[in-house]
Amino acid sequence: MENSDDIRLIVKIAQLYYEQDMTQAQIARELGIYRTTISRLLKRGREQGIVTIAINYDYNENLWLEQQLKQKFGLKEAVVASSDGLLEEEQLSAMGQHGALLVDRLLEPGDIIGFSWGRAVRSLVENLPQRSQSRQVICVPIIGGPSGKLESRYHVNTLTYGAAARLKAESHLADFPALLDNPLIRNGIMQSQHFKTISSYWDSLDVALVGIGSPAIRDGANWHAFYGSEESDDLNARHVAGDICSRFYDINGGLVDTNMSEKTLSIEMAKLRQARYSIGIAMGEEKYSGILGALHGRYINCLVTNRETAELLLK
């Protein structure tokens, strides 16, 4: 420990620096000592407990959860919205607000942004800030349309166009379905100029915003209602844990080849992995397996979720 004179000097310097907001250069001039000495004594004051710094975590009660998610799953970003005492729609809205702030912070001029479909992605898009000037970004769908199996407000084209309107961005829409009747039709569409234009953006995607599917979903977006009983039974038999853009994987993140694989028009998971930011937005116990599989497969490197789901993932 320092002698009493050193301690008094450290306290004096700390008081000037932290309480009176003086710069280290100003303190050095006032006390007649080198600036490097000021820096060294401030550091020593923290190390010896003379100076303590407290962060008020009430302003972000979920910060610890975010840090743990990043560490456990190697994420670039994790955002956890509060869920205590909130109805499901309120939780979804809060998650969308937090996700929109994240996207707004991460976007760079010239970025290509890809969108999937669904409620969670819609919540994020609706909360994107309305820009008065162009962000010079391009918004594109990364999956075909759901062929009337989703409400129009959740359609990938609705979300892509809506985001572009808010960001003052260029947009391209998908004039093809996500799931075809057979591989021959799919292959024919893939030869069209329209599909080639859309899919060319997938090769250089900067940011992806994706919802996450799961076999436990019980509402109108469940796999049985969306893909039909035969395909749904096939997914269950193959122990599928989740999907992104109708690309299926198991709980360990391994891709699962299904009866639909050769009939699907959406971004390949390898290309999704290459995006600078692949942002998954999902919440709820029923989405747990889908989120966990996506994290294990590293199909997303950013996660936006709620507190309850974050705690499940960290168990």
From Swiss-Prot:
CDD domains: HTH_ARSR. GO terms for molecular function: carbohydrate binding; DNA binding; DNA-binding transcription factor activity. Residues 24-43 bind DNA. One of its GO terms (biological process) is DNA-templated transcription initiation. It comes from the Bacteria. Pfam families: Sigma70_r4 (PF04545), Sugar-bind (PF04198). Positively regulates, in the presence of L-sorbose, and negatively regulates, in the absence of L-sorbose, the transcription of the sor operon. Belongs to the SorC transcriptional regulatory family. This is Sorbitol operon regulator. It comes from Klebsiella pneumoniae. The lineage of its organism: Bacteria, Pseudomonadati, Pseudomonadota, Gammaproteobacteria, Enterobacterales.
